A protein has these predicted regions:
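Ubiquitin-like/PB1-type beta-grasp interaction modules and other compact soluble beta-rich domains
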Residues: 1-69
Length: 70
């Protein structure tokens, strides 16, 4: 039986039938890794943890990109 995981990313609901990590998610959406801050279930994640954190059912993820300017 295939397990379906539903999670929130920046307030939007997503569903996956595969086990994915935060890094997989970042790569899928094409984010620039050097300009990100990620909140995972209300905790800020270090970029060294992105490949270790597996997205689970009902997780809440916020990805914020840093934009410079003047």
């Amino acid at each position: 039986m295939i397990e379906i995981n539903t999670f929130l990313l920046n307030g939007q609901k997503y569903t996956t039938s595969e086990t994915i990590t935060l890094l997989d998610l970042i790569n899928y959406f094409g984010y620039n890794k050097s300009l990100l801050v990620i909140e995972y279930n209300e905790f800020i994640c270090k970029n060294t943890e992105w490949d270790k954190i597996r997205i689970q059912k009902n997780d809440k993820i916020e990805i914020v990109t840093i934009v410079g300017g003047g």
